From Swiss-Prot:
Record gene name: pstA
Protein known as: Phosphate transport system permease protein PstA
Pfam families assigned: BPD_transp_1
UniProt main location, coarse: membrane
Family, similarity comment: Belongs to the binding-protein-dependent transport system permease family. CysTW subfamily.
Cysteines joined through disulfide linkages: none
Cytoplasmic side of membrane: 1-28, 103-126, 170-204, 287-296
Superkingdom as given in the UniProt entry: Bacteria
Entry function: Part of the binding-protein-dependent transport system for phosphate; probably responsible for the translocation of the substrate across the membrane.
Amino acid sequence: MAMVEMQTTAALAESRRKMQARRRLKNRIALTLSMATMAFGLFWLIWILMSTITRGIDGMSLALFTEMTPPPNTEGGGLANALAGSGLLILWATVFGTPLGIMAGIYLAEYGRKSWLAEVIRFINDILLSAPSIVVGLFVYTIVVAQMEHFSGWAGVIALALLQVPIVIRTTENMLKLVPYSLREAAYALGTPKWKMISAITLKASVSGIMTGILLAIARIAGETAPLLFTALSNQFWSTDMMQPIANLPVTIFKFAMSPFAEWQQLAWAGVLIITLCVLLLNILARVVFAKNKHG
């Protein structure tokens, strides 16, 4: 009887060792595949960044920020008008899109919650979040540009704002939902009106998270080309008239990169480097703001 028990124990131990060996093998295979996939993705990311830096750094100069876009096959010149135009488009898109997104997020988190209207808004917002930017550009072209019968900076602002609003809505709603409900109950117990509770308590508690969403939304629209091709188009001259086509960096990069002129291509690489650095800085700033809110 003792011999049978010893054999059974030995068989169980051997079975356990084989099972553990198989698990270790599967774990090594999964880890190797994960590391290989990560290395593959990082390789291309680093390659793209290095190509952008090495090719774009040659075109960086003071003239890039002070001179206008040059005529074809002409040395010198810069991207001053394109940079100014992009700044105007992003500024106005943020001015119009951010308040709308914040107010919609407040409604979803504080007023609508699970109402049918809130569900409809969330559904539409999810569609806008996943919609290709060129679809938004075509939509604005149909309802604005085609009706006005000319391209304009305001059409570009509308397109960029439509891309920005869904991000701000989602971030605002999520940040407000993270505020403990006990704070709301305490405010109600003191007789605080709902609008006062929202402005003085929930918004104040989630302001860093909302700011993070706004920064990410700005980074999202900073390099968009497709919607601007159908709305603001471009302008090779210095112009701040939002009722007319206005120069902007993404479309200028697209135009110069597709050209056969080496001077334009060099400016295009410099423009790509500027956009890359701006988006990188915005993402870093967003992470810093969010981390400060999380640990502060």
